[in-house]
């Protein structure tokens, strides 16, 4: 039935669905995992790197995380070439606002501006939607630290913790379980991000070259966006593995004690 309605983006099916937009969302479901966590003292993005090759130039170190302006960064899941077009557009919107009003663009306004463009591509014939979902982290004077997510339909929302890409449903349920509202520090958020990626990524063992992590904090009245170095990511993974081993030992000891009873 759907074949008659999915060749053009602008045609609704009898059930009121836009199949092309749904297919674009499907493309994101096969992309590398990206997650964002909001903490009291900052906000972070963690992403899975699929394109790891020892001959790749380290100059282009960041594959999934893009800096947009002094106060915002984003992470992408989906078709990378589409993502490049959208991140360039985001940077332009931010620069135009800065030029016009002499102050940085509020986070939500930047997200809304891009979502308007994404939405337009679901409405005009002869175009296809962008096959990209984005996670945005940022700080502005109105609402402090913020985390947003947008999808190919032009929909967006503010989140405390969320995930896009492969195995996102499992990751979101883990975040829901372990996210402590009002108590999250950046340190505990980093540990949680590594824990979630370790469980949801399709690899037998988590390694530093497969993960990209960026943090956004405030220091001396300025926003600082940092992409963690490989050594730092290695330390986080090592710490997580030690904690896992410790928890496993304690569990076995407890089971043994119960048996002895």
Curated annotation (Swiss-Prot):
Gene3D superfamilies the UniProt entry points to: Glutamine Phosphoribosylpyrophosphate, subunit 1, domain 1 (3.60.20.10)
Positions of post-translational N6-acetyllysine modification: 127, 176
Pfam families with a match to the protein in the record: Proteasome, Proteasome_A_N
Chain spans, region Disordered: 240-261
InterPro entries according to UniProt: Ntn_hydrolases_N, Proteasome_alpha, Proteasome_alpha-type, Proteasome_asu_N, Proteasome_bsu_CS, Proteasome_sua/b
UniProt superkingdom: Eukaryota
N-terminal signal peptide: none
Protein name: Proteasome subunit alpha type-4
